[in-house]
UniProtKB/Swiss-Prot annotation:
Organism per entry: Aliivibrio fischeri (strain ATCC 700601 / ES114) (Vibrio fischeri)
Keywords: Cell inner membrane, Cell membrane, Membrane, Transmembrane, Transmembrane helix
GO cellular component labels: fumarate reductase complex; plasma membrane
Family assignment from sequence similarity: Belongs to the FrdC family.
A Pfam family assignment: Fumarate_red_C
UniProt-recorded name of the protein: Fumarate reductase subunit C
GO terms assigned for molecular function: succinate dehydrogenase activity
Function, in words: Anchors the catalytic components of the fumarate reductase complex to the cell membrane, binds quinones.
Gene3D superfamilies linked: Fumarate reductase/succinate dehydrogenase, transmembrane subunit
Keyword Ribonucleoprotein appears in the UniProt entry: no
Transmembrane segments: 30-50, 67-87, 107-127
């Protein structure tokens, strides 16, 4: 074994800002932050529902706060952005073949968005 020190290239914390691909990746992954807030709000709401009508009314008042509404809109936008990037990558990662031919990427992406719309409508009708 050699006593030489291996070469370790210096990297700053912001190395990813210089590369558009990595910047896009970091923005995409950062969309989880507003979703964490949204998930915590839902869990607190579920706990409030169990505690009784007074706690539920208090949670509803909290959710009506304009800052909370704005954060929920940011969470929705982040979720839609994350879904769009996932849907656009899916045909590249797992091409779908029917009758020996690969389906067009646009068809696969539109089918996924159609499924999202159908499930959303179904949930809205049920609830």
């Amino acid at each position: 074994m050699s006593n030489r020190k291996p070469y370790v290239r210096e990297m700053t914390r912001t190395w990813w800002k210089d590369h558009p691909f990595y910047r896009f990746y970091m923005v995409r992954e950062a969309t989880v932050l507003p979703l964490i807030f949204f998930t915590i709000c839902l869990l607190v709401g579920l706990g409030s529902l169990v505690k009784g009508p007074l706690a539920w009314a208090s949670w509803l008042d909290f959710m009506a706060n304009p800052i909370v509404v704005a954060l929920n809109i940011v969470a929705l936008a982040g979720s839609l952005f994350h879904a769009q990037t996932f849907f656009s990558m899916m045909p590249q990662v797992m091409p779908i073949r029917l009758g020996g031919k690969t389906l067009d990427k646009k068809v696969v992406v539109l089918a996924q968005w159609a499924a999202v719309a159908a499930i959303t409508l179904l949930v809205l009708v049920i609830v």
